[in-house]
Amino acid sequence: MSASEAKPKSMTRAKQWSDEIENLYRFQTAGYRDEVEYRHVKQVEMVDRWPETGFVKKLQRKDNTFYYYNKKRECEEKEVNKVKVYAY
């Protein structure tokens, strides 16, 4: 099984905000588990990111609608525990 076909072995909920949690939040609001699933579904090598922060800049949903994100944090504190962290 290649990395692009990997299925998660487990899932936990985020406890506190971090850069990783911010990016997971962005993927999940666009309808994907994480970057692994996004890259597999959309067949892309790179995800658009803000150079200053490294946060995801733009994602395309499965219905081809684009989501655009700001340079700054978008995952509010009350949303952190809704973010799912997958382990492969």
Swiss-Prot record:
Q: Which Pfam families match?
A: Meiosis_expr
A cellular component annotation (GO) from this entry: nucleus
GO biological process per UniProt: cell differentiation; spermatogenesis
Keyword Transmembrane applies = no
Q: What InterPro entries does the annotation carry? A: Meiosis-expressed_gene_1
Keywords on record: Differentiation, Spermatogenesis
Q: What does this protein do?
A: Essential for spermiogenesis.
Q: In which family does this protein belong, per the annotation? A: Belongs to the MEIG1 family.
The name of this protein is Meiosis expressed gene 1 protein homolog
